[in-house]
Amino acid sequence: MTKREKIISCIQEGRGVLGIEFGSTRIKAVLIDENHNPIAAGDHEWENRLENGVWTYRLEEIWEGLQDSYAKLAEDVKNTYQIQLTRLGAIGFSGMMHGYMAFDREEKLLVPFRTWRNTMTEEAAAVLSECFAFNIPQRWSIAHLYQAILKGEEHVEKIDYLSTLAGYIHWKLTEQRVVGIGEASGMFPIDSAAGDYDAEMMQKFDALVADKGFPWKLREILPKVLRAGKMAGTLTKEGARLLDRSGCLQPGVPLCPPEGDAGTGMTATKSVEKRTGNVSAGTSVFAMIVLEKPLSAMHREIDMVTTPAGDPVAMVHCNNCTSDLNAWVGLFAEFAECFDIKADKNTLFSTLYQKAMEGDKDCGGMIACNYYSGEPVTGLEEGRPMFLRRPDSHLGLANFMRSHLYASLATLKIGLDILLKEEDVKIDSITGHGGLFKTKGVGQSILAAAMNAPISVMETAGEGGAWGMALLAAYMLSKKDGQSLGDYLDSRVFAERKSETMEPDLADVAGFETYTKQYQACLAAEKAAVQAF
């Protein structure tokens, strides 16, 4: 049987596994075969909007995006293999973690979806962090809930279910109110040993709001927590229609627990074991390090989440990464079009990224402050993208692009230095993935300089979270009894896959250190810009 015939047989017999991830600018669907290789894909571009001071996506945009990405994947199957996609072996959904989707008993959304990007919960996050003696970031679901309580928002007493984006989609397609443990860890603190929400902190929260007289206790409105590998329901008839507008997809497909983009990133990079880590760099950027032991102190810059299997993870999350860089690349594309030069997006990015490597190691006196939105790691409530240079700086394209690439990781470096230098966390391997690493060697070398550590990029780096989600669904479907997620990934998924590792260049490391000090000094100007403009 040829490779193509095997794939056709896999699809026709319903052994293909589907992963769909809702990123902040793209919804991607990936179908994999029994060897965990992508065999079809579809995607849909979308953008959050700022409405009444809230970063949000509308419900109709969520469903339109889901249906379009699935339809494109089904079309890819039809065009490539000349068959109709009607059956699946398993499905998994993932999305941007955190945020706030509150529903009443009639399953109606009570307020517009508040995404992770909002930095409106400072008071709630501070009170809860002190109450729990545990860092509660502003974007966590519990911070959004408590902020709504502090503001006296009327909808709170009507809440019947509080979910995330991935949890919402899973619920609508299966009627199951569940999330994976990694996704849950971005809603409320987790007790890794119990594999559930931290019971003591939950009691503290209920006591904190007891005088409000709400008709619910916190556990009653949060989704049930499941570790990777558990079955989390099946696709209902209504769910199948919601996913596939053509009506071809058969219901009854098993679904794994929905996970967050952090968990799918760990899975896609084989970073679920202790002393491993990964950096996901796109619109936002985060680094996750699986810990050997708890941190010695609470750090407001460090979030504690878990792997999809429930092991503790230290996470540095920054709201801003490549948005400003992407905007400048868009400007250069527009400039090229004035001269009737049509460059495709990939060529444009790779050309400009490669150009950056010719720049001065410290960017020659240029600083890009890339804050589109607020940045809790550095204490900014709002952002104003800004480019600064000294009069004696060398203004050239290479330094300009290099400064924007450095900026995309500078805030991450500020947070990571706490883990590496203050907490003395040990890391054996770091894997990079996401859009920043698509151009060979560039994002990888910049991250190696930022962390002063070797960075690996896998041949699957461009697959990203949707592929990681498909792997989690495949793990549920195909694991042996008692087989851990780490062992499954090692033996079944990554044994044959290649990766390239790049050691840090010492001159780059020194240049990035200089740049980061200047970047931190320029945050005073950024704060002033927020006030003035």
Predicted feature residues:
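N-terminal glycine/serine-rich phosphate-binding loop of ATP-dependent small-molecule kinases
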Residues: 1-111, 126-127, 158, 219, ...
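Active-site core segments that coordinate phosphate-bearing ligands/cofactors
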Residues: 2-12, 18-19, 85, 123-139, ...
